[in-house]
């Protein structure tokens, strides 16, 4: 039998938990249930939210789903599908607006945090470069390559062409591992070596190469790889 919202203790209902503990304490299911507001006669908003999220392996895939796909979930009509899509779009706009303020990169954590949300749930490797000025402000962020990264795909020419065009003082490169494990591969080390060497010739330092996993990351510089590939 499906649990209805009235069967959930009042203190454990999503809205009450939101008020008491804040949004960050809630699960994805609870956040979606709040946006849905109501369920059906047979299913609570929590159950509808659970069914919806089960249709999409990742939040990134859900965020890209067309209205027609969202409406296939029992309990979600056109109005609720539009409300969910509007909430997602608002989140995107907030993120874009935030990025208009040039962030300062003072640690690998800063760089990883800047791209981790965009990389979450991606099914292919994405290679991103952050171009910095002399004060380590990000003046440009660009996805340069998509696919299985190796030395033949990630060419220093493309990385540093953007650096020269934007008059960057340094570059930080990042890419994701869809497996969720950020451990560097031999190809990652090889690519980093070529980029370090090219940057040294051009006078544009590669400050770091960061691999982003599932809720974690590895800085090749912090792990000591830069000392062996100078």
Swiss-Prot record:
Alphabetized Pfam families for the sequence: RadC, UPF0758_N
GO biological process, one term: proteolysis
SUPFAM superfamilies in the record: RuvA domain 2-like (SSF47781)
InterPro entries: MPN, RadC_JAB, RuvA_2-like, UPF0758, UPF0758_CS, UPF0758_N
Motif JAMM motif, chain ranges: 175-188
Annotated binding of Zn(2+), by residue: 175, 177, 188
Keyword terms: Hydrolase, Metal-binding, Metalloprotease, Protease, Zinc
Molecular function terms, GO-annotated: metal ion binding; metallopeptidase activity
UniProt entry tagged with the keyword Metal-binding: yes
Entry annotated with the keyword Protease: yes
Domain MPN: 104-226
Superkingdom classification of source: Bacteria
Family affiliation: Belongs to the UPF0758 family.
UniProt cross-references to PANTHER family, sorted A to Z: DNA REPAIR PROTEIN RADC, UPF0758 PROTEIN YEES-RELATED
Entry protein name: UPF0758 protein ABC2615
Organism: Shouchella clausii (strain KSM-K16)
């Amino acid at each position: 039998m499906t649990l209805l919202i009235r069967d959930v203790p009042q203190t454990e209902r999503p809205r009450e938990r939101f008020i008491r503990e804040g949004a960050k304490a809630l699960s994805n299911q609870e956040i979606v249930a709040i946006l849905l507001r109501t369920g059906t006669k047979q299913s609570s908003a929590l159950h509808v939210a659970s069914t919806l999220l089960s249709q999409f392996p990742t939040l990134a895939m859900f965020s890209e789903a067309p209205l027609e796909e969202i409406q296939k979930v029992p309990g979600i009509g056109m109005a609720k599908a539009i409300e969910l899509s509007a909430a997602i779009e608002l989140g995107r706009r907030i993120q874009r607006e935030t990025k208009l303020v040039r962030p300062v990169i003072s640690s690998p954590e800063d760089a990883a945090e800047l791209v981790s949300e965009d990389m979450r749930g991606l099914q292919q490797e994405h290679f991103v470069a952050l171009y910095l000025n002399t004060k380590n402000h990000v003046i440009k962020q660009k996805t340069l390559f998509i696919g299985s990264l190796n030395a033949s795909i990630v060419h220093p020419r493309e990385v540093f062409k953007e650096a020269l065009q934007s008059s960057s003082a340094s570059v930080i490169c990042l890419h994701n591992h869809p497996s969720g494990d950020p451990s560097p591969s031999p190809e990652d080390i090889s690519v980093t070596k070529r980029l370090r060497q090219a940057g040294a010739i051009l006078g544009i330092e590669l400050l770091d190469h960061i691999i982003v996993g599932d809720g974690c990351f590895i800085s090749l510089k912090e792990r000591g790889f830069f000392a062996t590939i100078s």
